[in-house]
Amino acid sequence: MTSFLDDKQTQSFHQNGYVIVKNFFNDEETKLLQNASKLDPAIRDHLYDRKDSEGLTTKMMAWNHPDDSIYGVTARSEKIVDTMEDLLGGEVYHYHSKITAKEPYEGGAWEWHQDYGYWYNNGCLFPLMATVMIALDKCTKENGCLQVLSGSNNLGRIDHALLES
């Protein structure tokens, strides 16, 4: 098994609950994923609208089985699989894939949540899972990037509740 992370990155993952790896995929690989997200009819035709608590819209698509598309191949790639096995300490499997197409500055948001809270409700009794996020565009606080609560992986499962606006 090839390790794609150094010891400091691995330690950060276990301590903080996440690790950011810039340039994990090279420019050519990233460009292929970007083009597929915009041009592949299998993706474009299956996006659906998801409204946030303020009524703003984010387009998304989710599927459970990695297919032969570039996204399925990426999910099964040595880079992803070996990295996740290294971080989680054993064999891993694909749980689901999701594309979130959020328009910068105006698109909808995801309310604060803990992924394990969703996984638990879907039958995953232990938090022995991880999310891989591949940003295809520049993500900043100004345009609505993913934000995380460092160390929240050590809090146990946090039940989700819908908040009224």
Each predicted region: which residue ranges?
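Short, conserved beta-strand element in jelly-roll/cupin
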Residues: 113, 121-141
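Alpha-helix initiation and capping sites
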Residues: 27, 74, 126, 140-142, ...
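Non-heme Fe(II)-dependent double-stranded beta-helix
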Residues: 1-16, 21-122
